[in-house]
C-alpha cells in the first residue's frame, strides 16, 4: 500500500491526551449506574521478569507482551480488576490493569483501562485494551503483518458488530470501526529530541469486516475477512513536510473512506491492510 502524508493549513480540531482522558473517564462513569452490587468484580495480580545473557532480549520473549517487556533485562508486577455482567439483552464489561516495571521506558503503566457495552448485536467500547489480530493464535505467532501485540495498547473508541451475527443459518458477519490516538509523543521527544524529525499526536483508524461460512454446530467452518489500519494526522516537528499533517473532521472522514487525489499526489496517512482466511475442523470427541 503506497502511503504518504499531506499537510493542511485549515482550522484543526486537536484531540490531545487530556481530552481523550475526559472522554474515556466519562464513558466509564456512565457505567456506574448500570452496575449492580450483586456480582463481585474479579481481581488478579501477576509478576513477570525477563533476564538474558546476550545483548538484547530474544524476539520470542518480547513478542505478545503488549509492551510490558523490553530489549533490556526487565521485571514488572501487575494487578487488575475486571467486571462482567449481563442484564437481559445488555452486556457490560470493564477492566483496569496497572503495572510497575523496571528496565523499560516507563515505571508506572496503565496497561488496560476500558469499558465495553453491548446491546443485542451492536456494541461500543472505549479505552486502552489489549488486542490481538483476528484468527491469529498468539501462542504460535509473534504478531500479524498489520497489527502485533508487541506494543502497549493505545486509547481507542470502537463501534460495530463486535461478535458474529447470523445473516442466514450458514453465514455470519462481524464488522468493526475504530479511531484511536497515539500517546508516544513524550517518548519520541525524549529519544529523538532535536536530532531527527518525528510526528506527534498521530491519529489511528481501523476498520474490518469478516464473514463466517458454515454451521457452528457442525464440523467445518470457513472464515474470510479483511482489515485496514491507518496512521494519519498529527504534527511533524521538522523536515520538508513539517507542521500540520491533517487533524480536522475531514481528515477523519478521509481515513474512513480513502480517496485518490490523482497521479503524483500523496495519500492521507499510512495505510496498511491484510486479508485473512481460516479453515476450521471441529471434532467434539477431541479435547484441545
Name every feature range the model reports, one short phrase each.
Residues 39-43, 83-93, 118-122, 164-174, ...:
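Short loop/turn motifs that connect adjacent beta-strands in outer-membrane beta-barrel proteins
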Amino acid at each position: 500500500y503506497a502511503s504518504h502524508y499531506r499537510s493542511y493549513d485549515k482550522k484543526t480540531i486537536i484531540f490531545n491526551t487530556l481530552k481523550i482522558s475526559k472522554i474515556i473517564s466519562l464513558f466509564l462513569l456512565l457505567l456506574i449506574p448500570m452496575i449492580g452490587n450483586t456480582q463481585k468484580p474479579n481481581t488478579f495480580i501477576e509478576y513477570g521478569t525477563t533476564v538474558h545473557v546476550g545483548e538484547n532480549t530474544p524476539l520470542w520473549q518480547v513478542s505478545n507482551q503488549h509492551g510490558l517487556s523490553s530489549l533490556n533485562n526487565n521485571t514488572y508486577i501487575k494487578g487488575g480488576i475486571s467486571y462482567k455482567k449481563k442484564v437481559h439483552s445488555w452486556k457490560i464489561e470493564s477492566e483496569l490493569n496497572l503495572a510497575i516495571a523496571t528496565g523499560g521506558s516507563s515505571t508506572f503503566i496503565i496497561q488496560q483501562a476500558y469499558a465495553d457495552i453491548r446491546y443485542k448485536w451492536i456494541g461500543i467500547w472505549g479505552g486502552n485494551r489489549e488486542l490481538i489480530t483476528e484468527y491469529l493464535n498468539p501462542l504460535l505467532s509473534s504478531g500479524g503483518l498489520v497489527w502485533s501485540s508487541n506494543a502497549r495498547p493505545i486509547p481507542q473508541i470502537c463501534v460495530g458488530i463486535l461478535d458474529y451475527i447470523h445473516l442466514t443459518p450458514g453465514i455470519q458477519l462481524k464488522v468493526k470501526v475504530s479511531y484511536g490516538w497515539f500517546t508516544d509523543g513524550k517518548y519520541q521527544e525524549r529519544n529523538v529530541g532535536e536530532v531527527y524529525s518525528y510526528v506527534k499526536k498521530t491519529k489511528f483508524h481501523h476498520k474490518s469486516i469478516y464473514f463466517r461460512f458454515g454451521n457452528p454446530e457442525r464440523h467445518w467452518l470457513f472464515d474470510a475477512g479483511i482489515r485496514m489500519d491507518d496512521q494519519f494526522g498529527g504534527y511533524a516537528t521538522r523536515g520538508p513536510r513539517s507542521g500540520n499533517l491533517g487533524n480536522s473532521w475531514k481528515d477523519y472522514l478521509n481515513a474512513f473512506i480513502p480517496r485518490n487525489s490523482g497521479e503524483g499526489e500523496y495519500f492521507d496517512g499510512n495505510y496498511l491492510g491484510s486479508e485473512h482466511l481460516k479453515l476450521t475442523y471441529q471434532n467434539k470427541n477431541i479435547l484441545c
